[in-house]
Amino acid sequence: MKFRDLGLAGLSGAQYFDPMYQTFDSKSEPELGPARLTDLQAVMRAEGLDAYIIPHSDQYQGEYLAPRDERLAWLTGFTGSAGFCVALADRAGVFVDGRYRVQVRSETRAPFVPVDWPETSATAWIKDNLPKGIVGFDPWLHTVADIDTMTRELTGTGITLRPCDNLIDRIWIDRPAPVTGKAFVHPIDYAGRSHTDKCRDIALDLRTARDAAAVLTMGDGICWLLNIRGSDIVHNPVIQAYAIIHDSGCVDLFVDAIKVTDVMDHLGDQVVVRPIDTFLDALAALTGQVRITAATLPRAAYDQMIAAGITLRDAVDPTVLPKARKNKVELDTARECHLRDAAHMCEFLCWLDAQNPDETTEIDVAIGLENIRRRDPMLMELSFDTISASGPHAALPHYRVTTATNRTLRHGEVMLVDSGGQYMDGTTDITRTVAIGDQPLAVKQAFTRVLQGVIAISRLRFPRGIEGRHIDILARQALWSAGQDFAHGTGHGVGHFLCVHEGPQGISRKSAVPLETGMIVSNEPGFYQEGSFGIRIENLIVVRQSPDFQGFLEFETLTYVPIDRRMICVDMLAETERIWINDYHKACRDNIEPRLSQETSVWFARMTAPL
């Protein structure tokens, strides 16, 4: 269905596009998995391996992968953004966390066996299923920390790890070609600081720690440092590269030269571009103490430096915290970016409300939202494939609609839309769950409990030093009181025209990083009733100094889009919660209403009316 068929032609200034930033083709081929596993097992036998590990990772250890690096999906059929597989001689375990436990069952076939992770670790499962033997792994796809942990846990079991070439690459005949996207400059008007200043600061950090150099392998950190962006990974404006930053502030950038021809003048003499296949030799030639990050450094790079006798010090990647602490320019431009995106969302939600559910599909919804966002000249990409999930599909936290799964909206169901844009001046991520017709009381009650979690985080004031894991419970307490919960974190860090998932900060049971001023995180509790419905409400928030109490922090909300008041059980709310919702909707009116079309303004006034 074309965009102009969706009833959006009357929107002021509308343009018409076919979808460009996302597709709806099915990426899962579960029916091919068993035969591919048989081919892998034959190669394993030839190599003398009893098991082989296939992670969801690439040689740069990013969360999101280029098509040629989707080895886990190619082998198993599982298309989630996190997980791994352990292949044995007669079966294979596919390890996924709570976000994907329903999805993995529909995307894999025997002899693949879904395994709940992290409740069951890879080593525990291997020990239970392999009395003794050799486990192979590609040292480019596993970090130093991963292999150290597994080695320690397998000590004394008769099971050993062996690095080897990638076995999937041997049997993946039609593997996609490498990406060749071009890097471009991220202007200082949005970045806030020059790359020379950033390099100078990190060089000082290295000298203070007596590190001669630091090895950088994460694309978002390298792009942030050098004020460049790329298109090597869909929806993530990064380049695939390695870098070494020296204590002088000079940088060796290891990348395919064709990718950076347009940014050479910007990089200047301080950055030396080198062929990516010289990276290992450059590591072996380093002198002095070298900073690495065991949690992200590929084991292959580590082994090369150890063999060369390099003195290594494990510490946090020096770009991680400065990147997470957004500067004033980044925050100011992000605020403007979020206001524009909120207006786009309101235009979309108004349109969605006016549709006949019986004539509207999940793909229609995703196309309609994308095309509204694409009227914004600052939009560069989506920040991820839109989660356009109706009815039972909304119970899959990371559902991706395809032509095979596409369903029509129905009265009496909810519609969950999780989406975002990559703009030159910021990255957005927002989820709204809306009513399609009247809702059962149980659904509205669950929605209200999720909303209470959003409010609890939003209103929080806390002392410096508090970590994300210390406050995660606040987003769950209303759900817990009803015996309900959600199997994902409450929030993740968000980049600035970078990856929509950015560390090190977050709000979850595992997040042990103190929250600091300038850090942007999502606030997105949810509830999922398998086979029936799902609810998630997500705003982005930024940590700031409390104006009232010295030494205390609080959250500033960046996202101003109405929360569906038709889904709220007002009698479940405390007075402070009702006031928060009314104040939030007033802030929506103050910030967004002037940006809306006349038609949407009428809808907007109704949706932001006081409770």
Regions found by a protein language model. Name each.
Residues F3-L611:
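Active-site neighborhoods and metal-handling regions in enzymes and metal-associated proteins
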